[in-house]
Every structure is written in C-alpha cells, then in structure tokens.
Amino acid sequence: MWKLVVVLTVNLLQGALTDVYVMKDVTLGFGQALEQCREESQLTEEKMEEFFHFWNDDFKFEHRELGCAIQCMSRHFNLLTDSSRMHHENTDKFIKSFPNGEILSQKMIDMIHTCEKTFDSEPDHCWRILRVAECFKDACNKSGLAPSMELILAEFIMESEADK
C-alpha cells in the first residue's frame, strides 16, 4: 500500500513540475518578442526591465504600455484575432510548439478565455489585455502552474551563455 502511495505522489509531483517547466518555456518563448515590441508599445527601458519579473508576486499591472507590449507580442506570434481577442487555434499551436506543450495547451487556453470574458467590456485593448494578463497570472498561481523567478532567471542565464 505504501509503495502505491509513494508512486502516486511521485507521479503527481513530476506532473506538476512538468507543467511548471512547460509554462517556463512558453514564457521565455513569448518573451522573445519583447525587444521588437518595445518601441511600438512605448515601453521605457525601466518598464521593459520590470517586465522580466512578470511572475514575481510584487509585479504591478499598473501601466497601460505593458498591456500594449503584451498585445504587440501576441500579434508578433499571431495569437490575436482582428478584435484583439485570443486566437484559440494559433495559441494552441504556439503552446504546442514547446516541449510537452500539449500537456498545458488546453488548460492555458481555457484560463485565458475565462479571463478574457471577465474583462470583455473594457474598450481599450491595452488595458483589457493587461487585465487579462493579471487574471491569467493569478489563475496560474492558484493552480500551481506559475514558474518561479529562480527558474526563469536560471534558464535566461543559460540561454544567454549559450548565445555567446
């Protein structure tokens, strides 16, 4: 009986870790468009630096230009419809383009869609997208999907070293 409990616990932990690693990969992949979107969204160097701390508990969703940057980044990967709502099929393909992305794709799409419905009445696309991002982050934290800043930074440093 104890062996079964241990095996089930290990499997649950491995699944949770896999989810976090997939989220880390999607985050870093999505973030690749940030530099290209900095000017278009009028993001200062300081605010761009803040953006790298998205998963920190103290990250503030206060500045409209952050929403504009997320909108630009989403457009860069063709993840939005003409009305600046999530394009479900393209978002699914984007998430599945990462290792083990199929594990989280539907869950992420459902969370984003739920958040979009909550803020659908916001007429300003940048503000709405910023609110959706905050809602999505909260949903990820509640479901244990949010990667730690340590994990994000470690991967970022490894990628930077590999580029040298």
Curated annotation (Swiss-Prot):
Q: In which tissues is it expressed?
A: Antenna.
Segment forming the signal sequence: 1-18
Q: List the disulfide bonds.
A: C37-C72, C68-C126, C115-C135
- Protein's GO biological process: sensory perception of smell
Which family, according to the similarity comment? Belongs to the PBP/GOBP family.
Q: Write out the function statement from the record.
A: Present in the aqueous fluid surrounding olfactory sensory dendrites and are thought to aid in the capture and transport of hydrophobic odorants into and through this fluid.
Q: How does it assemble?
A: Homodimer.
Q: What is this protein called?
A: General odorant-binding protein 1
Native source organism of the sequence: Bombyx mori (Silk moth)
